[in-house]
Amino acid sequence: MDYIRWIAMGWMLSCTLVNAWAQPAMFKGADLKLGEQLIAEHKCSACHTRRVGGDGSDIYNPQGRINTPGFLRGMVEQCNTELNLGMFPEDVNAVAAVLNRNHYKFK
């Protein structure tokens, strides 16, 4: 019986890990390292900290504000346009994928 229990626990753990790393289809193949680099390079946290105070993380919290992967990508594109960051579409996607992985967790 212990053998079956171990198999079941292993299966549940593997499903949990796969879901933890799952990304929506629009973020599949996004370069997460590039996204992290761009977030640091463009000082996204500093701007968001000025806008919402504290450490800036409250920008991710308003319920229902960003409720789909497409809307998240659109918000990153809006920052890109308004701040004239010059990011290419794949850059915007990479930044949105990192934000999704770290904060929103859309599947």
Predicted region positions:
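Soluble non-cytosolic domains of exported or imported proteins
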Residues: 29, 66, 70, 86-90
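N-terminal export/targeting leaders of redox proteins
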Residues: 1-29, 106-107
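Electrostatic cytochrome c docking/interface patches
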Residues: 19-39, 81-84
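C-terminal capping alpha-helices of c-type cytochrome domains
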Residues: 85-107
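Cys/His-enriched microdomains
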Residues: 42
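Gly/Gly-Pro-rich "capping" loops immediately C-terminal to redox-active cysteine motifs
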Residues: 32-37, 45-81
